[in-house]
């Protein structure tokens, strides 16, 4: 990971394009028309706004073009000037970027966790670059209705592997959900954890937390039941169980349009597993979604479960068929933060 300084340059343009070839042709013509223009970090002209209005301009920072926003005003599509590689750029206030990215800095690299490729420091902003993605797991499950066991096992193993690596490295993720996992390839066979910005860095072996952090559909019973502390890792594992159930069944194990009713169902910890799932899949779900935190599998134990070594070409003949059913995974409902419900 490279960290260096550069000054952003605003390039005036009319309209915007999602076509990177057009972006490069436009930049090329600008550079040809102004041969004396330098794009070096030592440019002496005053800095433009750090996050410009991208409907009217493109910003050049270091060796990258920042194009249209992907999320709010802090996540942008970016293109490498020379290779044409497409990336994602997150923009942070320079005063707090180190704190926001601290979990990334303290964790070793893992194939299923999004890695920072480069950080460029402007005068007031930090520009953090990541590899591009190809959609998220939540949208994928909504589109597919639900996943066959073989596909779910392959993807969920990668998800659990990322979480286990974080736990082993002293991080509790706190806000685990399908939307946090994104695809690394167009074929949607490889996933990675999108960010660690909500993660909590543990001080030693004690993983006790007291904050009520996360999304209603994924929150564990003990977070709802106590005003004291709870095991952060066990709460993460509960969220993994919600994710696995949703991938295989096509709906959340606990769902209700009223938050109070939803929380009552989660506190009881009772849910139904369709008979269409294989015995090993049912076993894994029940071993994770246990009401008592100490009875749940750990993230590392999940990876050792026999479901992942199943010969699905044989076992799937009677289980996991994609029969038509109601698809109840909402677009954004119950994906909000818990904060409004406890303030």
From Swiss-Prot:
It comes from the Eukaryota. Residues 29-45 have a biased composition (Polar residues). It holds the Pfam family Pkinase. It is found in: Cytoplasm; Cytoplasm, Cytoskeleton. One of its GO terms (cellular component) is nucleus. Its main location: cytoplasm. GO terms for biological process: negative regulation of fat cell differentiation; negative regulation of interleukin-10 production; positive regulation of proteasomal ubiquitin-dependent protein catabolic process; regulation of MAP kinase activity. Keywords: Cytoplasm, Cytoskeleton, Protein kinase inhibitor. InterPro entries: Kinase-like_dom_sf (IPR011009), Prot_kinase_dom (IPR000719), Tribbles/Ser_Thr_kinase_40 (IPR024104). Gene3D superfamilies: Phosphorylase Kinase, domain 1, Transferase(Phosphotransferase) domain 1. Residues 25-50 are annotated as: Disordered. GO terms for molecular function: mitogen-activated protein kinase kinase binding; protein kinase inhibitor activity; RNA polymerase II-specific DNA-binding transcription factor binding; ubiquitin protein ligase binding; ubiquitin-protein transferase regulator activity. Expressed in granulosa cells of the dominant follicles of the ovary and down-regulated in ovulatory follicles. Residues 61-308 form the Protein kinase domain. The keyword Nucleotide-binding does not apply. Belongs to the protein kinase superfamily. CAMK Ser/Thr protein kinase family. Tribbles subfamily. Interacts with MAPK kinases and regulates activation of MAP kinases. Does not display kinase activity. PANTHER family: SER/THR PROTEIN KINASE-TRB, TRIBBLES HOMOLOG 2. This is Tribbles homolog 2. It comes from Bos taurus. The gene is TRIB2.
């Amino acid at each position: 990971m490279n960290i260096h300084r550069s000054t952003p340059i605003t390039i005036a343009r009319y309209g915007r394009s999602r076509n990177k070839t057009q972006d490069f042709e436009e930049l090329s013509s600008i550079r040809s028309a102004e041969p004396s223009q330098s794009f070096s970090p030592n440019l002496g002209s005053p800095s433009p706004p750090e996050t410009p209005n991208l409907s009217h301009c493109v910003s050049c920072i270091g060796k990258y073009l920042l194009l249209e926003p992907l999320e709010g005003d802090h996540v942008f599509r970016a293109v490498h000037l020379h290779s044409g590689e497409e990336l994602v750029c997150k923009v942070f206030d320079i005063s707090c970027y180190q704190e926001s990215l601290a979990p990334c800095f303290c964790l070793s690299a893992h194939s299923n966790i999004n890695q920072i490729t480069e950080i460029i420091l402007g005068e007031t902003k930090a520009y953090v670059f990541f590899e591009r993605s190809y959609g998220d797991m939540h949208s994928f499950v909504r589109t597919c209705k639900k996943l066959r066991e073989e596909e779910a096992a392959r993807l969920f193993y990668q998800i659990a592997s990322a979480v286990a690596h974080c736990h082993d490295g002293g991080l509790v993720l706190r806000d685990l959900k399908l939307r946090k996992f994104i695809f690394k390839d167009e074929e949607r066979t490889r996933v990675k954890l999108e960010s660690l910005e909500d993660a909590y860095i543990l001080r030693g072996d004690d993983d006790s937390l007291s904050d009520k952090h996360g999304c209603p559909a994924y929150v564990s019973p003990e977070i709802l039941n106590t005003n004291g502390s709870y095991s952060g890792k066990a709460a993460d594992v509960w969220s993994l169980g919600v994710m696995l159930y949703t991938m295989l069944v096509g709906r959340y194990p606990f769902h209700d349009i009223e938050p109070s009713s939803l929380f009552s169902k989660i506190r009881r910890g009772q849910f139904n597993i369709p008979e269409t799932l294989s015995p090993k899949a049912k076993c894994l779900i029940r071993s994770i979604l246990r009401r008592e935190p100490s009875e749940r599998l750990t993230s590392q134990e999940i990876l050792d479960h026999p479901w992942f070594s199943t010969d699905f070409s044989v076992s799937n003949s009677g289980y996991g068929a994609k029969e038509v059913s109601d698809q109840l995974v909402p677009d954004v409902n119950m994906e909000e933060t818990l904060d409004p419900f406890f303030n």
